[in-house]
């Protein structure tokens, strides 16, 4: 539909449309450009704004129930846009009334790239939480690991995927053989996850 975004739910058994939610681009329930969604239920649908640091909660009628501004955290630090476009490797997680969203490496964290290949950055949180009751925003204590060894010719790449098993968050980083497992984003346990079938030489990976 021109001028609208549609979220369509299908019934797997009947192969028919179960619910169609229209989000206009203008008006009180609008988002000018969506950046993915996460459905906790048909009456609790979280939609991300592509151009603003905001997540909106919609009901099945396409009405905004609430909105969450995450422009800055409680200490005044800027956040990056939380994208909900990729459901399989960066899903939104809602736990104990808090929204857990991904954070890319902070633009303010980059320090230097002496050779144009090895990018160095200060500690950068991997996630941020939004308390749906108080709307307080906090960065996680868990930060990106030292992704690349110096003088190896690796390009900067913050590619990371995450799953949540109902208790633990499990992170997998591009070009790293360990899985990072955490329950609270404060302490982390590493598990080796080398492939049994591939012996990939990482040096010289193209940018």
Question: How would you name each of these model-derived features?
Answer:
Residues 7-10, 62, 116-133:
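Beta-propeller blade signature
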Residues 26-32, 74-87, 148-155, 199-205:
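Short glycine-/Asp-/Thr-/Trp-enriched loop segments that recur within the blades
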Residues 16-46, 50, 71-82:
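Blade-loop segments of beta-propeller domains
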Residues 17-24, 65-78, 137-145, 188-204:
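Beta-propeller fold detector
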Residues 1-3, 43-50, 97-108, 162-174, ...:
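Short beta-strand elements that form the blades of beta-propeller/WD-repeat-like
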Residues 36-40, 88-96, 157-165, 207:
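Structural signature of eukaryotic scaffold interfaces centered on beta-propeller domains
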Residues 12-14, 59-63, 131-135, 183-186:
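Short loop/turn segments that connect beta-strands within beta-propeller blades
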Residues 102-122:
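Short, conserved, GDST-rich strand-edge loop motifs in beta-rich repeat architectures
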């Amino acid at each position: 539909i021109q001028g609208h975004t549609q979220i369509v739910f299908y019934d797997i058994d009947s192969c028919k449309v179960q619910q169609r939610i229209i989000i206009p681009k203008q008006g009180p329930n609008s988002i000018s450009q969506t950046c993915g969604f996460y459905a906790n239920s048909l009456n609790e649908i979280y939609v991300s704004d592509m151009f603003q640091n905001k997540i909106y909660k919609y009901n099945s009628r396409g009405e905004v129930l609430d909105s969450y501004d995450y422009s800055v955290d409680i200490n005044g630090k800027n956040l990056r846009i939380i994208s909900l476009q990729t459901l399989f490797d960066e899903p939104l997680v809602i736990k104990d009334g808090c929204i857990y969203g991904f954070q890319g490496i902070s633009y303010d964290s980059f320090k230097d790239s002496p050779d144009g290949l090895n990018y160095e950055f200060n500690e950068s949180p991997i996630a941020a939480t939004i308390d749906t009751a108080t709307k307080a925003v906090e960065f996680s204590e868990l930060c990106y690991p030292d992704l690349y060894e110096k003088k190896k010719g690796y390009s900067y790449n913050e590619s990371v995927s995450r799953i949540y098993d109902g208790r633990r968050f499990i992170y997998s980083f591009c070009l790293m053989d360990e899985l990072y497992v955490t329950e609270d984003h404060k302490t982390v346990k590493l598990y080796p996850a080398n492939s049994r079938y591939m012996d990939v030489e990482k040096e010289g990976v193209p940018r």
